């Protein structure tokens, strides 16, 4: 078992902490070619099994193994956008505060006061409060995702009248979809496509967007307790 960090944006931190999001997909190293002959899945996926993707390099005529960053049993501490509590207007207490705990309205109020949150990548280990345990790992093309798996990615079902249903992550208040109703997809897959592409820089959409159908590692996980001892946190 390894203990490693993992990044999530603010909406997904909320979904993880609410046990709504239990899967995440991460690009397999995009610097390698990924045509039909260069990537091959060579092991079946199930909890506890090492899963890898084989790449055949036609120029060097050799095989390279690209292991996933996380394996079943690993515990991941979530890096999220944060701040020192004393930096917030009107707060003098010590400790840390987290952007995902604030509603969209509260965040807009803080923005008007020119308050800046610290990037999640800079969250110190001692400030971590959310921990997840990897229970499954497998490799697949991004477009292989099912509707059920889209729901596991943090997509929720919404309706205004109990007749028409649409799908999206929750907004900052947790009571409405993230997107305007007219822009909210009517299927889980459409919502996942919209969510995925929103995280990809426009310049990389041709290679990494949903339409490009890149290879990804899919990780299934569940929340768990803090694995750190006091000594490990200090390190």
Spans of features found by a protein language model:
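Secondary-structure transition motif
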Residues: 1-235
């Amino acid at each position: 078992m390894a203990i490693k960090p993992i990044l999530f944006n603010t909406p997904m931190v909320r979904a993880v902490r609410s046990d709504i999001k239990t899967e995440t997909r991460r690009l397999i190293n995009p610097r390698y070619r990924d045509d039909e002959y260069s990537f091959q899945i060579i092991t079946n996926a199930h909890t506890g099994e090492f899963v890898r993707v084989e790449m055949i390099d036609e120029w060097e005529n050799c095989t390279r193994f690209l292991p996933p960053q996380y394996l079943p049993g690993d515990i991941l501490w979530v890096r999220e956008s944060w701040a020192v509590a004393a930096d917030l207007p009107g707060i003098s207490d010590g400790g840390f505060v987290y952007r995902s705990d604030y509603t969209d309205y509260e965040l807009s109020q803080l923005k008007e006061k020119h308050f800046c949150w610290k990037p999640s990548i800079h969250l110190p280990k001692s400030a971590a409060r959310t921990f997840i345990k990897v229970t499954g790992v497998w490799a697949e093309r991004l477009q292989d995702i099912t509707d059920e798996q889209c729901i596991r990615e943090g997509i929720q079902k919404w309706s205004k009248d109990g007749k028409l249903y649409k799908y999206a992550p929750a907004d900052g208040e947790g009571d409405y979809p993230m997107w305007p109703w007219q822009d909210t997809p009517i299927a889980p897959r459409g919502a996942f496509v919209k969510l995925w592409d929103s995280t990809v820089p426009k310049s990389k959409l041709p290679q990494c967007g949903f339409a490009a159908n890149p290879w990804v590692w899919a990780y299934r996980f569940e929340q768990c307790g803090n694995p750190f001892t006091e000594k490990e946190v200090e390190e």
